[in-house]
């Protein structure tokens, strides 16, 4: 059995990988945009003597060129909708209870980018 945190991470990684290029860490210089970078994962355990119940918050980061505003918005929307449809992982039943999206302008060297942040919270049963 793996932790609920890793279980959600694996499920989110699979969903993102089906919709775009996904990385677990900063991709190499020269990587094509847009891409997805899985960020932090937060585990909030509920006290229980006989089972593991938890909420897991997964942060997903999206990067695109400054000419790809529509692309990043659509990619974030597609990932969010696909995650909302998830009802179970390899070891747990899950339910998305909350999501939050933000799109920011960002400068990386001489490149102007869009940086999207999608935070999703799952209840793990």
Label each region the model flagged.
Residues 55-63:
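A short small-residue
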Residues 1-14, 43-55, 92-125:
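Short, charged interaction patches at domain edges and termini
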Residues 1-50, 74-81, 86-93:
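Small/polar-rich, solvent-exposed N-terminal microdomains that initiate assembly or binding
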Residues 67-74:
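Short, conserved charged micro-motifs
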Residues 35-39, 62, 102-107:
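Short amphipathic alpha-helical patches
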Residues 62-66, 122-124:
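Short beta-strand-to-loop capping motifs
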